[in-house]
Amino acid sequence: EXSEQNPNILEIKPGDTVKVXT
């Protein structure tokens, strides 16, 4: 497993809105 175990973070791009789901 890598370090991509974040169901909250989905493809975050620079300048885009961070979907963390707060």
Curated annotation (Swiss-Prot):
Optimum pH is 7.5. Coiled coil: none annotated. GO terms for molecular function: metal ion binding. Binds 1 heme b (iron(II)-protoporphyrin IX) group per subunit. Its cofactor is heme b. Keywords: Cytoplasm, Electron transport, Heme, Iron, Metal-binding, Transport. Its main location: cytoplasm. It comes from the Bacteria. Residues 1-22 are annotated as: Disordered. It is found in: Cytoplasm. GO terms for cellular component: cytoplasm. Heterotrimer of alpha, beta and gamma subunits. May transfer electrons to the iron-sulfur centers of the beta subunit of chlorate reductase. This is Chlorate reductase subunit gamma. It comes from Stutzerimonas chloritidismutans.
